[in-house]
């Protein structure tokens, strides 16, 4: 295993650990999800470069586009949550169903 692969696995597990530890605020969960997606993007890019294929790099662009869409949807949900309830706590998400 290369050192880059080990670093991306470490970043991925740090993102998972951040989600498990910081379950109180919605913004911290969104940031940890972005960390997971960035580490996945980096590992797929390194894998495509090591495989010497340019076809796999288009999958990375699709992943990056979908992660930007996920971030914008999450931020819009957080803005709606903070405007209506003056809080970004995860416990207030259940109130949005009413």
Curated annotation (Swiss-Prot):
Chain ranges passing through the membrane? 1-21, 29-49, 61-81
Q: What Pfam families does the annotation carry?
A: Oxidored_q2
Out of the domains of life, which is the source?
Eukaryota
Q: Does the keyword Cell membrane apply?
A: no
Say if the entry is tagged with keyword Transmembrane helix. yes
Reaction catalysed by this enzyme:
a ubiquinone + NADH + 5 H(+)(in) = a ubiquinol + NAD(+) + 4 H(+)(out)
**Which N-terminal residues, if any, form the signal peptide?**
none
Cellular component, GO, one term: NADH dehydrogenase complex
Q: Could you state one GO biological process linked to this protein?
A: ATP synthesis coupled electron transport
Its family?
Belongs to the complex I subunit 4L family.
Protein function: Core subunit of the mitochondrial membrane respiratory chain NADH dehydrogenase (Complex I) that is believed to belong to the minimal assembly required for catalysis. Complex I functions in the transfer of electrons from NADH to the respiratory chain. The immediate electron acceptor for the enzyme is believed to be ubiquinone.
Q: What is this protein called?
A: NADH-ubiquinone oxidoreductase chain 4L
Provide the species name.
Answer: Patiria pectinifera (Starfish)
């Amino acid at each position: 295993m290369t050192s880059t692969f080990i670093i991306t696995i470490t970043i991925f597990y740090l993102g998972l650990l951040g989600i498990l530890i910081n379950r109180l605020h919605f913004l911290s969960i969104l940031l940890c999800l972005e960390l997971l997606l960035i580490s996945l993007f980096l590992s797929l890019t390194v894998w495509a470069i090591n495989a010497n294929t340019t076809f796999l790099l288009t999958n990375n662009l699709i992943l990056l586009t979908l992660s930007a869409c996920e971030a914008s949807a999450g931020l819009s949900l957080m803005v709606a949550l903070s405007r209506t309830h003056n809080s970004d706590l995860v416990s207030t998400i259940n109130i949005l169903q009413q």
